[in-house]
Structure formats: C-alpha cells, structure tokens
Amino acid sequence: MESIEQQLTELRTTLRHHEYLYHVMDAPEIPDAEYDRLMRELRELETKHPELITPDSPTQRVGAAPLAAFSQIRHEVPMLSLDNVFDEESFLAFNKRVQDRLKSNEKVTWCCELKLDGLAVSILYENGVLVSAATRGDGTTGEDITSNVRTILAIPLKLHGENIPARLEVRGEVFLPQAGFEKINEDARRTGGKVFANPRNAAAGSLRQLDPRITAKRPLTFFCYGVGVLEGSELPDTHLGRLLQFKKWGLPVSDRVTLCESAEEVLVFYHKVEEDRPTLGFDIDGVVIKVNSLAQQEQLGFVARAPRWAVAFKFPAQEQMTFVRDVEFQVGRTGAITPVARLEPVHVAGVLVSNATLHNADEIERLGLRIGDKVVIRRAGDVIPQVVNVVLSERPEDSREVVFPTHCPVCGSDVERVEGEAVARCTGGLICGAQRKESLKHFVSRRAMDVDGMGDKIIDQLVEKEYVHTPADLFKLTAGKLTGLERMGPKSAQNVVNALEKAKETTFARFLYALGIREVGEATAAGLAAYFGTLEALEAASIEELQKVPDVGIVVASHVHNFFAEESNRNVISELLAEGVHWPAPIVINAEEIDSPFAGKTVVLTGSLSQMSRDDAKARLVELGAKVAGSVSKKTDLVIAGEAAGSKLAKAQELGIEVIDEAEMLRLLGS
C-alpha cells in the first residue's frame, strides 16, 4: 500500500501535468470534473496531514505559468480563483459558514451570475482609455494580450459617461458563442486547420494568437464580472451596483445577473439557469454566488487562493472519461457513412451515454483514435454525444486501429469518397436498405417518374412490409397486394397500379433524375440526356467525357461515373427496362441547322418567370438548339433573368456574360 507521502506526490505530479496541458498548451486531456476530483482528493489529504503541505503544491497557488511567447503583465491586485461546490448540501454548508463568520443578525443578499466557460482576463483603463489587457496566468502574472483584446468588438476601447476613474481594472470572461464555435470548426474541417474540442478551448486558442489579425476573425465576446485596481473615483457599495455602473460606462454585463434574498432563492436561480442552459447560445458550467454587500465582503476576507464571500456552484459535468469498446459504421438515408463509437456506458450531464458520433474518417485521424482508447466524451444540451479527445497517456497496449469500410455495411456496394469531401457514401442508392425509403420516394415524385397517388405513407408501408426493395419492384405490384395496405381499398389500389403503368412512359431526362444520382438535379439530368442521347452511351462515359457536359464538373462527373460503375445499380436499371419503362428515341438536333438565336448556346435561367413555367421555357430552349445548364460558369453564353434573380445574375455580371430579361426571351422565342 502506498504511503501518504507517495499519494501526495503522485496527486501533485498528476495535477501539475494537467495544469500544464490546460493553461500552457491549451490542450486539456481530461474533463474539468476529473481535475476537480483530483484537486478535492489532494485537499482532503493535506487537510488531514497539514505537516505535509509543500509551498509548491497545486493547492497553494491559483493557476499555471504564462505562455513564454507573450510578454508578461504583473497583476497589481491578484486574480484569485473561486472555490467550488457541486451539490445543494455543499452550497448550504457554504451559506452557513458565511452567516457564522459575519457574527451578526445582518441579512445576507446574494448576487448570482452565470459561470461562463471561457478565459478570465483583466482589462486596464486609464482615464477611460483601454491601455492593457492580460490573462489570469498564475494569478500574480499573466500574458499581455492587449493587441488581441482590442479586436473584440464587445470590449470598448474608450469608456463613456460620468465619473470615470483615473485607473480602472475590470475583470471578466472572454468566450465564444456556440454558433461561432461551430463555424470555426466547420471552416477548419474544410481547410484542414485545427479543430477545437469545445468553445472554451477555441476561445483560449483565439485569444492566445501571436497575430491579432487571426483573433480579429474569431467572433469572441466578453462579459464583465468584477474589479481589480480602482483609483480616482468611487464605486457603489454593492457588487450588483458596480456591475450596473460598468454597464453605464459601456462595458458588457450579462443580463442574467440576479439578486437572491436567501439560500432557497439561490437554489431556485441555480435550477432555472440549469434548465435554460441549452438555449443560452454559449457555454456555462455553473453559477457564481457572491455576497452582494462590499462591506460584508471585506469582513469575510480571503483564504490563500479564493475569497470567502463567493463560490462557484457547478453543474453536473458535460464531459466524462470512458473507454471505446468498438467502432461501428451507420448508413444514413442519403448514403452517408458515419462512424459511431460504442462506449463503456458513462453518465454525462445526467444521461447514460453508451454511443458517441465520430463524424467521419478525417475526425478519427485528427483524434488519433484507436479501439480500446480512454477518451473524453462531451454532451452539451441536446447535442449528440461526441468524442472530443483521446487520453494518449493511458492508451492500452492492445488498442486496435479503426479501419474505415471500403464497402457499405448494409448492402455491400462500393464506398465513394470524392476528393475534397469529408463524408464517405454508399454508391448502392437503388438497392441499399438504409436508403430505400428516401430513394423510392424520390423515384415516384412529380418531377421524377410522376406516379400519381403514390405518397410517402404508401412508400413507408411498402418498405416496412417488405413488398418493395428496389424501384423495379414498384412495377411488379398488383392491386391485390396493395389492398393489404392501410386505407387502400380495391379502387384506390387499382388507381395506383394504373398510375404505375402510365409512368412507364417517361423521358430519358426524367428517368436519370429519378435514379437519385448524387448532385444530379433536373437541369443536370437534362444536360446529360441531351449530350449522350442514350443510356448505353452515358453508362460507358468516362469521367473526362462526362465533364464535357455543361454544368458538370469533376465532382458531379465522379458521382455519375461511380453510380453506373456499381453493378447492383445497373442490374436494377435492367429490371426497370424489363418491366417496360421506356422513353422516346433521341431526336438528334444539329444546332448548325437550326435558325434560332439560342442554337448551340449554353443558357442559364434564374429568377421567376411570369409568362410561362420554367419547365416550359427549358423545353422551348432545348427545341431551339440550346443547352440549358443549372449554374453560371465560364462556359455559359447567356443568362435569362426573371423576377428576383439572385446570385446567378450577380455571377453572370461579374463574368461579363450576356443577360436578357423574360420579355426579350419571349421575343426571341417568337422570332
């Protein structure tokens, strides 16, 4: 069994390691709750054995050393931390200690605030002008982040109003709203940049940039919650009064600050904020409870690292540690393949979590995740639990690499991942069980095969009863089988069969659109049909040949090529043709022989038309030898702009492409 000295040494070493990762490297390896637990364990041992307390123990200081890359600023008034409580019993004990220490019948009013999950900073104003800003650092010395703080729009560079002190040091939290955090990570995933585990890390990473121009691009904000240095003026004698004065001078203060007249009211505030937490739009990890009276604060004083008149009442942790037992792959309704971590069940924010999303192969690589790893799980609000980082220092020897599938785990079709896209997808859109309902609903829709009377509820039942597996099975349905569906009498069933029979006669463009090839909309389908003319020619086309079609680039060409390369898709198409699906033979139009101003031109329609439908306009243009594309590019010859034309019109003007309105189009069609 370890001696007390050994236990203390091990705890202090572990805490120092994690303080370094958190404060210096901005790369925490464990959640806050685990750090708090280790600190409580150390404090309890030191309380029982005060003779073993050392000056360098983590309990005897506030934080960690500042980053060496920044110059340092010494705090004239130390920036202390707060003690924490984690349950009602502990808070009520804190309340009693305050009442007992005051030794009077004087009532205590509490000022309650949100405990923001960001980076604590101090900002010094001289004669109302911002002159410096620093991080907390070790509580005595912080990093000089003046240039970066000046880029935060919420922080005034000059205070306004009356009676502004000659020197005023305000303290508060710089943080990143959730919407901004999500955008930063979205951009990082797209460009291959650093992805942050949570908004707090993103805020710290943004504020500790050596180049202020990078900080300026991050949507950081700030709430003020206290004061350090004060010279040349007086402030109100209550904490809330001071916050309201700061607000008058132009400093942002949270609108959730609330006065509570009793411990019971504090508990009501705590639970109300906990309930509202998912809708705030930014991360908090508890509430801060402060004695409102400055006179009472002075009476209560401080301990070594924290005031006796304030406490942080923390919420149940949103992050916990557990082990990855396996990684499985789910297929979504659009064919997207998502890796899911199967976890050793753990309670996170009051919910038992056994699964967590891993997003995609890039995310697994970024995390360096292996099966068997110890990981940190985060669950914020209603967000699906996710793995935020791996505890590499505790990786087991028998951990296994995660192997991303090359074939769909549902149908066995090839997995496609287009260059530049993070998501891998199943190419078996016509046979994949995971995509079945959505692909069938698309196939029968009005702009595709246009099967009258076959709505979503009928498709749902057909799939659930396993009457239909592929689009070809639709044309094998009988009235007798359909009458087995809910609310489907003999007459309605026969109407559906008749509609299916009618739908067999279609166009090549509609048929291509109905197949649901990724990113092949109506315009692209029409372009492919017009260019290749026959299904056989399209199936045999290379990626290079496909890119010759107007509006088709490398990405769409890859999707089309991969779709027809999948044997299961070709088999379903053969079945559809065998069931009688057909379209007229192509009419070869030689643009040179057509006397029309549109002949041989690539045309784009944008905005709404008042004199004819867009479909009719497309049909007339194709008849007159035009190629109708869905987007504007350098290949575009002409843009027809209807009412409320948007980005396509702007791009055409930017590229110097000819633009005409609907009236001119009608005149030219008539000519």
From Swiss-Prot:
Q: Could you tell me which Pfam families the record lists for this protein?
A: BRCT, DNA_ligase_aden, DNA_ligase_OB, DNA_ligase_ZBD, HHH_2, HHH_5, Nlig-Ia
Residues given in the record as NAD(+) binding sites: D32, A33, E34, Y35, D36, S81, L82, E113, R136, E173, K290, K314
Could you state one GO biological process linked to this protein? DNA replication
The reply to whether Zinc figures as a keyword in the UniProt entry is yes
- For whether the record's keyword set contains NAD, the answer is yes
Q: Which NCBIfam families match?
A: dnlj, PRK07956.1
Q: What does this protein do?
A: DNA ligase that catalyzes the formation of phosphodiester linkages between 5'-phosphoryl and 3'-hydroxyl groups in double-stranded DNA using NAD as a coenzyme and as the energy source for the reaction. It is essential for DNA replication and repair of damaged DNA.
PANTHER family referenced in this protein's UniProt entry, alphabetically: CHROMOSOME TRANSMISSION FIDELITY FACTOR 18, DNA LIGASE
Indicate what this protein is called per its UniProt record.
Answer: DNA ligase
Q: What is the lineage of its organism?
A: Bacteria, Pseudomonadati, Pseudomonadota, Gammaproteobacteria, Enterobacterales
